[in-house]
Amino acid sequence: GSSWPPDENIFIPFFNEHKDWRLLIAPHVIAEEHLKLILSLIKGKKVVRYTQTTPEEAAEADVLIIDCFGLLSSMYNYGDVAYIGGGFGVGIHNTLEAAVWNMPVIFGPNNKKFQEAQGLLKSGGGFEINTYEDFSGLMSSLMNDEAFLNQAGDKAGAFVAHLAGATDKVLASVKL
């Protein structure tokens, strides 16, 4: 979700090597030159852009690029694993939008100031990667071990569920 070029340079080559997997990319920057860069990185896959396709074509595509705003949070429910962008720049984007769908969440190292990311890491529902090798090893483990994939997803979802109602709990403890 909300990927940047350093993120795309990690996950796109991995998916190029795994022909049976499908990818949904929601780039943070949807300028035409950035979309062309993404397209140039993808090899041997049928790629469609959300704004230029039909539901039938999107369902058949190997890669769906979300080239408009406002859809990302609802798109996570179609995935098995989420990669949250920004972790190789100033910081990651929203991890909870993906975790609420009971899926493992992966992100880069610039996540320390984000309490949700730290909580996901501690819960076992979130994973930090620093290199392509980290990402490749983790994705291979998740996709080849269904029990691990499901456990990590359940832990991510449980972490979000634990946060639900936090405002009510705080307000209940405050005497007015």
Regions found by a protein language model. Give the residues of each.
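Nucleotide-activated sugar donor-binding and catalytic core shared by glycosyltransferases
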Residues: 1-176
